[in-house]
A protein has these predicted regions:
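Generic N-terminal targeting/processing segments that precede catalytic cores or assembly contacts
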Residues: 1-381
Length: 381
């Protein structure tokens, strides 16, 4: 069984991730984990926090001499900004700082203090902050190394920011390559316009959202299942993506566009090559049919809402005085769609890893790879 948990607050001492179920014998590249962490921090439109933090991962358990041992892997990301928050985020003692009482529309603030019976919104916003995704990216970086050992790769690209759309015609998803630009967009002209839109929004004290795609390449046929709802791969991927802060919608393949066309134009026809292997000319399904991977690239698209912390605050309420006020301001980003695409890669990697381990086992990498090879040989053709 594969699972992971995260812990920690945005301005606490550290964030941690516990990853359980990675097979023994997987070689771990710490530099690659930290490269993924750096990708999450970059991006045009990010806030001042990124100039403070330089996220590095410490592996505290589960790895010895560069190889997993089969027991839980503990990952730690230290918050450098903690030294500026030791009084406000002290584990023990008496609060001396003014409480945060002006809720932000679109955030967890108001609902959280009601649900958990808190008087200070900071008790909610610290954990609900997207800073938590640093721990997810760390966990996802471990999962990616497992998937790469199985021949599976994951990439992403941004296709829309604030209504500025990239040209997505004729994309070769099977060979889509990683993009290291500061907006992770493969359309240079659109990216320049996205940058202008972000700059204008920042000057106006506003924020922007957008859309990105995560692509899983070289996925084996038949991972997932049609037999029970919770075994369906598309359910697991959609849930993983929707769990990311600020994500409001997810599509797989053509997604909601299926509503606009007849079935004859959308279902991916199958053909035989000369060697009797099956191929398709289209991939409207996005690599999943009947809750199972079908061998085509898996395409998951997600929409991120504009960040709800605005430098020109919206109208709101004060939970203590019961007066109408402007929402509180926290240091935040203008746009974090590029960062969300990296988090999306991590969450898809974690979900795919769970599905792969469910099918091929989790004791040791030798067994996993042998099981995968035997299975691929059986289903040829």
């Amino acid at each position: 069984m594969f699972r992971f948990l995260t812990a920690g607050e945005s301005h606490g001492q550290c964030l941690t991730a516990l990853v359980e179920g990675i097979p023994a014998g997987l070689k771990i590249n710490l530099d690659e984990i930290n490269r993924q962490m750096a990708r999450r921090q970059k991006g045009y439109g990010r806030g001042g926090r990124m100039s403070i933090e330089t996220d590095k991962v410490d592996i505290l358990s589960g790895v010895r001499f560069g190889e997993t041992m089969g027991d839980p892997i503990t990952l730690r990301v230290v918050n450098k900004d903690w030294e500026n928050w030791t009084d406000r985020m002290s584990v023990m003692g008496t609060p001396t700082w003014t409480k945060v009482t002006a809720a932000r529309p679109g955030h967890a603030d108001y609902v959280g203090i009601k649900k958990y019976n808190r008087e200070d919104i900071r008790d909610i916003l610290e954990r609900s902050s997207a800073r938590e995704t640093a721990a997810r990216v760390a966990a996802g970086a471990v999962a990616r190394q497992f998937l790469e050992a199985c021949g599976i790769k994951i990439v992403s690209h941004v296709i829309n920011i604030g209504g500025v759309k990239a040209n997505t015609d004729n994309i070769d998803y099977a060979n889509l390559q990683p993009n290291d630009s500061d907006l992770n967009c493969n359309d240079a002209q659109a990216e320049a316009k996205m940058r202008e839109a972000i700059r204008d929004a920042g000057q106006a004290g506003d924020t922007l959202g957008g859309t990105f795609e995560v692509v899983v390449q070289n996925m084996p046929i038949g991972v997932g299942s049609h037999i029970q709802w919770d075994k369906r791969l598309d359910m697991q991927l959609a849930g993983a993506m929707m769990s990311i802060q600020a994500i409001k919608g997810v599509e797989i393949g053509d997604g909601f566009d299926y509503a606009n066309h007849p079935g004859s134009q959308l279902h991916d026809e199958m053909f035989y090559n000369e060697d009797k292997t099956v191929y398709r000319k289209t991939n409207h399904a996005g690599g999943i049919e009947g809750g199972m991977s079908n061998g085509e690239p898996i395409i998951v698209r997600a929409c991120m809402k504009p960040i709800p912390t605005l430098m020109t605050p919206l109208h709101s309420i004060d939970i203590e005085s019961k007066q109408e006020v402007l929402a509180c301001k926290e240091r935040s980003d203008v746009c974090a769609v590029q960062a969300a695409s990296v988090v999306g890669e991590a969450m898809i990697a974690l979900a795919i890893t769970k599905a792969m381990i469910d099918k091929f086992g989790s004791d040791c990498m030798v067994d996993v790879l042998q099981n995968l090879q035997t299975y691929n040989e059986r289903i040829k053709g």
